[in-house]
């Protein structure tokens, strides 16, 4: 029952995000399994740069308030363990250079979020967000593939995702239940 409740919260949260993006006429693709959104680095940044473009600032100004407002809603906030902003690069170039670039890009998005957060979050919501927000660079790890080939444009991205408090426990329980079911069927 506890597993169903937590899984239900995640499903409800993803549904609430979709609904709010639709109501704000924002074309945002949400990963059905994780609730993550991928922001196109080609819009956010010039190639090989970590300073936000004007178009990127405009995009973030529309998307981040909606995403954060839903996550900070009291019905979900208690379950929220982390809000993560993750930068990724394509597979060309040097790993360490790309690690620095991806970290700088993730930090640029996080910094932008806090520049304006008090205009759409209450003081308590802002405090909670500060306790939960992380910013990470992943270099060229986890590239995006299209038709078996690395999609360089899609691989250059910043993802915004959340993690629920009991998610790790649920994943462990799922593994145990799957192993138990397999053992019983043998």
What is each residue range found by the language model?
Residues 44, 49-57, 84-172, 176:
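Periplasmic OmpA-like peptidoglycan-binding domain that tethers envelope proteins to the cell wall
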Residues 1-81, 165-186:
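Periplasmic peptidoglycan-binding/tethering modules of Gram-negative envelope proteins
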């Amino acid at each position: 029952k506890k597993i169903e409740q937590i899984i239900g919260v995640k499903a409800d949260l993803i549904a609430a995000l979709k609904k709010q993006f639709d109501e704000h006429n924002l074309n945002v693709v949400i990963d059905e399994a994780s609730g993550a959104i991928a922001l196109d680095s080609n819009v956010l940044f010039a190639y090989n740069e970590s300073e936000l473009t004007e178009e990127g600032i405009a995009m973030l100004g529309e998307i981040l308030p909606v995403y954060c407002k839903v996550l900070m809603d009291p019905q979900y906030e208690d379950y929220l363990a982390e809000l993560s902003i993750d930068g990724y690069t394509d597979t060309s170039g040097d790993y360490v250079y790309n690690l620095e670039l991806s970290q700088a890009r993730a930090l640029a998005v996080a910094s932008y979020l806090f520049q304006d957060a008090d205009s759409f979050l209450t003081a308590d919501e802002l405090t909670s967000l500060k306790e939960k927000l992380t910013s990470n660079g992943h270099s060229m790890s986890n590239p995006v593939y299209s038709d078996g080939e690395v999609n360089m444009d899609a691989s250059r991205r910043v993802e915004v995702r959340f993690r629920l408090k009991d998610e790790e426990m649920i994943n462990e329980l799922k593994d145990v239940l799957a192993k138990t079911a397999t053992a019983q069927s043998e």
